[in-house]
């Protein structure tokens, strides 16, 4: 059965999702691109540049069919959370973007994730829903990732790390073994987190220290 996949969102990240879908199509002919859908003003008629012709309207105007799925084409955790929650209310089915070899059997992964290539992971990992691993991200053994997190390019989650929800992990960040990250945090690029952080804070440096709140 064909899977008609829509991308909800706009700007550069939605376009990146489109090209990763094209990569997936090369090995799975059941995947078809339905078009771009806006969400509450995010994603509209000026956001898609050379892909503008694929914009088909707003989510609120679209009636989803049985074979239709959604990719959340937004990077920021707060926006992903909002789109994910709104679409769950109308029972939309979510599509996970993954270009690569089969994941190990011991990896548990939820719905609506984006695993941009290359994505490298070890074993006994749990990943929740609607996360973004935005290229060359490494996740180590026995790590747990919640929902709606963003991992910047070349970030590394080492073994036994626990991560909550709605965190923004910058490019080239290293989360060292057994550290614990709460909810709603922002970690600046190139930072190294040794023990972890609680909730709604902003961290930077090596070793990373709290430099403010993420409100």
Model-assigned labels for residue ranges:
Residues 18-20, 82-86, 198-199, 215:
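Short amphipathic alpha-helical segments
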Residues 96-211:
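Structural signal for interior beta-strand "rungs" in well-ordered beta-sheet cores
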Residues 1-3, 31-33, 65-67, 91, ...:
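A general structural motif
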Residues 9, 70, 94, 140-141:
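Generic structural signal for conserved hydrophobic packing positions in ordered secondary structure
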Residues 55-108, 112-122:
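Compact structured core domains
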Residues 1-74:
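A solvent-exposed beta-alpha-beta segment
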Residues 14, 42-43, 79, 103, ...:
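Flexible, glycine-rich phosphate/dinucleotide-binding loops
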């Amino acid at each position: 059965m064909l899977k008609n996949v829509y991308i909800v969102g706009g700007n550069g990240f939605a376009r990146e999702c489109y090209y990763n879908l094209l990569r997936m199509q090369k090995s799975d002919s059941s995947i078809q691109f339905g078009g771009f859908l806006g969400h509450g003003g995010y994603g509209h008629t000026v956001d898609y540049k050379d892909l503008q012709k694929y914009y088909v309207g707003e989510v609120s105007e679209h009636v989803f069919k049985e074979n239709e799925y959604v990719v959340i084409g937004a990077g920021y955790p707060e926006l992903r959370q909002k789109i994910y929650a709104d679409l769950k209310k109308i029972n939309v089915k979510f599509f996970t973007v993954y270009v690569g070899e089969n994941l190990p059997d011991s990896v548990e992964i939820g719905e609506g994730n984006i695993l941009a290539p290359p994505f490298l992971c070890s074993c006994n990992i749990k990943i929740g829903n609607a996360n973004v691993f935005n290229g060359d991200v490494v996740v180590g053994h026995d790590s747990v990732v919640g929902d709606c997190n963003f991992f910047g390019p070349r970030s590394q989650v080492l073994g036994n790390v626990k991560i909550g929800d709605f965190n923004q992990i910058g490019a080239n960040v290293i989360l060292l073994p057994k550290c614990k990250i709460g909810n709603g945090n922002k970690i600046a690029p190139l930072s190294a987190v040794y023990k972890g952080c609680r909730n709604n804070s902003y961290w930077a440096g090596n070793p990373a220290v709290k430099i403010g709140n993420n409100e």
